[in-house]
Amino acid sequence: MHRSARWGLGAVGAGAALIVGLDLAALGEMDPFRRTISEHGLGERGWLFGLGVALLAVGSAAIGVSLARRRLAGVVGTVALLAWSAGLLVTAWFPKHDWSVGPSLSGSIHRAGSVIAFLSLPLAALIIARPWRAERHRAALAAFAFGIVAVLWVLGMGAVVMVGARSGLAWWQVMPLGLVERCLAAIEVIALTALGVWAAGKPVGLVEETSAG
C-alpha cells in the first residue's frame, strides 16, 4: 500500500468522522436540513470543525501526491485535487458569515473557498479516473461515477437557484440548503475515498505515459 495514500485515507476518514460527530452532537441545537455544515465553525466547537476540515484537506493532498507519484494522475487532475484541498483549508481558516451580526470579509472568503472546493473535486475525479476506465479498476470506476453524480448534483442546484430567482426567491430559500450541501459533501468524500483506495491499491501495471489529466 502506498504510504501517502494510506495516511491520506486515514486523515480523510478522521476528518469526516469528526464533522459527522459535530452534526450528531448539535442535532438538538441546529437544523441540519437548513443550516450548512460551516455553521459549526461559529460555535464553541468551531476549532473542532476547523480541525476536521483541515484533516480532509491534508488527507486529500496526500492522496493527490500518491496518485501523481504512481503516475495515475496527470498535471490537470492533480491541480484540480489540490484546488479542492486549498479550498477546504480556506473554509477551515475563515469562518462563514455570522448573520446575527451581518456579512463579513471572512464570510466572503469562506464562501469563495467553499465554491472552489465543491467544484474542484468532481472535476478532479473525472479528469483523473476517466483515462483509466478501460482498466476496470473498481475504485477508479467508482471515483468516475461519483464524480459524475457530483457534477449532476451541482447542475441541479444551479437549475433550482435559477428557477427560484425567476420567482423572486433568494438561492437559500429555494432548497433545504443544509441537506443539499451535506448530500453533495458526502458524494464528493466518497469520490475522494475511491481515489484514495485506488492510489493505495496494487499497481495496475507499468505506465509509460499518462493523459494530460
Where are these regions (language model features)?
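Terminal transmembrane helical module of multi-pass membrane proteins
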Residues: R130-G213
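Alpha-helical transmembrane segments of multi-pass membrane proteins
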Residues: G13-D31
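Juxtamembrane helix-break-helix junctions at the cytosolic face
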Residues: I63-A73, L126-L141
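Interfacial segments of alpha-helical transmembrane regions
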Residues: H2-G10, L72-A83, R136-V149
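Interfacial helix-start motif at the membrane-water boundary
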Residues: E39-V58
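Membrane-proximal helix-loop-helix units in multi-pass membrane proteins
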Residues: V90-E135
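Membrane-interface interhelical loops and short amphipathic "cap" helices
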Residues: E29-E44, D98-G107, R166-L177
